[in-house]
Amino acid sequence: MAGDGQDVRTYDVELTTLLGKRSGSLGVRLSGECFSGVLRLMKQENPVQGQLSPDGQCRLTGSIRTRMGAYPFEGEGHLLPECLEMILRCGGFPLPLRGNRREE
């Protein structure tokens, strides 16, 4: 979005869980050092928010909704223009989240 200082990105992601890998997407809207977005997994839309440093290190929070309930998480890792790699800590379990930016 030219002129408003925001950058919109969509990543195709894979979350590694205790029950296997789950594919989805992460859409983010960056504004300065903050971002918000939606993590789409298991047919659910999960709002997320976080902070991003100039070198790509990030922290994010949100929750993952399933048929069984909602599971809050905190994550950290790297959110780069071309890819992302993070660890989400959910219920004491580390869940790797990796992905590549979708061509738009």
Residue map of PLM features:
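Central antiparallel beta-sheet cores of small beta-barrel/beta-sandwich binding domains
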Residues: A2-E104
